[in-house]
């Protein structure tokens, strides 16, 4: 029987992490943990309560009082905040554009990492984010770092948003993704960076199926 591995998939905004991670988890019958959704959930909660996203102490305290659940359903995964389904709300631009502000706080990240490590401790998980291979699951057997050009990532996000009926502008998305890259890469706590033992995959000219296929091949090799 194949050994149950921990799979860490990192990369910048809109590199295809979540989509690929879901496919890999489904093919392997592993649990998928979308850490980005957890940061989006606290950002959404703070915005809803008119909390100051730059106030680290207040945001950390709010997070400690907030229950965030990732629930598997036949269609994928739903995100609950204190029992309320916020799956759609957390994907809106208002949250996307401000999640990096909430995610840069040390107190917030420490609490999130603690929760994520508890979720991933038994193996058999696929976890995606910015600091999974470097910080959350540093001992993961499989570490992947996905890359894609800013233009390609903006194009993907544009098409994704159009499908959902959101009003979007391609040039604005390029600016927003570049700004998020800068915030994620330059933050003091757990910045976006590739783990030394991660395998890098440039997804710019690859389909989602091709990227998932490459990762599954790596997983098969490590499972033996």
UniProtKB/Swiss-Prot annotation:
Entry's Gene Ontology molecular function annotations: ATP binding; CMP kinase activity; dCMP kinase activity
Coiled-coil residue windows: none
Keyword Ribosomal protein part of the UniProt annotation: no
GO cellular component terms, A-Z: cytosol
Major location category of this protein: cytoplasm
Protein family per UniProt: Belongs to the cytidylate kinase family. Type 1 subfamily.
Protein name in UniProt: Cytidylate kinase
Source organism of the structure: Bacillus velezensis (strain DSM 23117 / BGSC 10A6 / LMG 26770 / FZB42) (Bacillus amyloliquefaciens subsp. plantarum)
High-level lineage: Bacteria, Bacillati, Bacillota, Bacilli, Bacillales
């Amino acid at each position: 029987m194949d050994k149950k591995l921990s799979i860490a998939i990192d990369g910048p905004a809109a590199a295809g992490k979540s989509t690929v991670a879901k496919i890999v988890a489904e093919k392997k019958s592993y649990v998928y943990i979308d850490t980005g959704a957890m940061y989006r959930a606290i950002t959404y909660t703070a915005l809803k309560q008119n909390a100051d996203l730059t106030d680290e102490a207040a945001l950390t305290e709010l997070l400690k009082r907030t229950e965030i659940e990732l629930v598997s359903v036949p269609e994928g995964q739903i995100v609950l905040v204190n029992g309320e389904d916020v799956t759609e709300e957390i994907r809106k631009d208002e949250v996307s554009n401000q999640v990096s502000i909430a995610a840069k706080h040390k107190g917030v990240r420490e609490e999130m990492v603690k929760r994520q490590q508890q979720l991933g401790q038994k193996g058999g998980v696929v976890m995606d984010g910015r600091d999974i291979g470097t910080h959350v699951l540093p001992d993961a057997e499989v570490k992947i770092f996905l890359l894609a050009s800013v233009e390609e990532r903006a194009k993907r996000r544009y098409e994704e948003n159009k499908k959902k009926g959101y009003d979007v502008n391609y040039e604005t998305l390029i600016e927003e993704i570049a700004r998020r890259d800068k915030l994620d890469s330059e933050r003091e706590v757990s910045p976006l960076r590739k783990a030394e033992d991660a395998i890098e995959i440039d997804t710019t000219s690859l389909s989602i199926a091709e990227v998932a296929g490459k990762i599954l091949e790596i997983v098969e090799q490590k499972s033996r």
